[in-house]
Amino acid sequence: LLQKKWSDLYGAGPFVFTHHHKTDKFEYRNTSDEADVSYAFGYLGDTMIQFIEQHDETPSIYRDMFARGEEGFHHIGILVSDFEEELDRFLKMGFDLACRLWADGVDAAYIDTRSVNGVFTEIHGDPNHILGEFSRWKRAHEKFKVGDTYKLERNNKLT
């Protein structure tokens, strides 16, 4: 697993896993077809790292860049207080909205900024419950040592 490699190599982690994530509302390039994806979230210093695995061949922002078995840097994520304003700002600059979703009580969108930086830009709302969750993960990272178990359950117990 990449998470284990990053943990051993850089001290990243622990990682919180979300398997086969489903959104409440989803749109990818004007379709509602949602790919089957799993996520692992963790910190390396002050930087959140997100590993994403797509389990199927549904067209997606991930398959836009990587075929099955390929890996690489996919997006930069930005937490925003005014989601609609930030989305509008990117659209007015001429960037395409590749994907928009609503999950876990928060809006997120992926803007196709590859022409500028080679990757997508994710904008993500910053409600208190999300900031609290990210803060818990960051605190777990601050206590984390290379060689520790690299998985963190949602209730913050190391596994």
What are these regions (language model features)?
Residues L1-V16, R29-D96, D112-T159:
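Glyoxalase I/VOC metalloenzyme domain signal
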Residues C99-W102:
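Short beta-strand
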Residues D104-D107:
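Short acidic/glycine-enriched loop/turn segments that link adjacent beta-strands
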Residues H19-K25:
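Short active-site-proximal "capping" loops at secondary-structure junctions
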Residues K25-F26, A109-Y110:
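Short Asp/Glu-rich motifs
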